[in-house]
Amino acid sequence: MESKTVLVTGSSRGIGRACALAFAGAGYHVFINCRTSTDKLETLEQEILSAGGACTKLPGDVSNPETVSSIFREITASRGGLDILVNNAGIAHFGLLSDMTDEEWRTVLDTNLSSAFYCCREAIPHMVSKKQGRIINISSIWGTSGASCEAAYSASKAGLDGLTRALAKELAPSNIQVNAIACGVIDTEMNGRLDREERAALEDEIPAGRFGTAEEAAGLVLMLAEAPSYLTGQVIGMDGGFL
């Protein structure tokens, strides 16, 4: 029996990397992607292949619709299409909204939200034809509560939550499930800007008393990929009780 396929965008590091490893360990053929850290993507591919997994690297900027179309043509040519899509590509921007440039705003929205739209648009026709598929969006608690000095990031994740709920209703008749994970503070490079005092203060605000790990987030993503089909349209918080 041929293995299922999954594309994890933004998978060279952090949550995306952990997701790729989790899916590979579960027997999926994993398509991995990133925009700039192609050396890390190569390392990840070799790690998966060396462990006996199935992996294909597809570097490219998923905030560009033409690039996304090219990526999906390669997936279709090699495996026919996707069973699972994990929209993980994302960037943060910290600073006052009044200081943001138009380009900075567009870059955050395009990377975090438009990329999910482009990938969903390409993945859905194959899933509909099979009457089966899963789309999992990596969101954030800031999409629900908002974060000071992270207006663009918060707005992009709120949009991703809305996309999740709306698309779940649109695709449920075709037996395609769409869910999101609203991550709390996860110990990845994205939070590397925090100094020791800022980190300690943030940990004090989290009831669990610590940051989450990328592996914990990936475990929930894998669970959603294999969850009952009646579970759809949900934005599931994974935040150590923060919200």
Regions found by a protein language model. Name each.
Residues 140:
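Residue(s) in the substrate-gating loop at a strand-loop-helix junction
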Residues 206-217:
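A conserved structural motif in NAD(P)-dependent oxidoreductases
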Residues 120, 156, 164:
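Active-site helix of classical SDR
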Residues 96-97, 104-109, 198, 202:
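Substrate-binding pocket helix/loop in short-chain dehydrogenase/reductase
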Residues 172, 177, 231-233:
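Short, small/polar-rich loop/turn modules that mediate ligand/substrate recognition or access, typified
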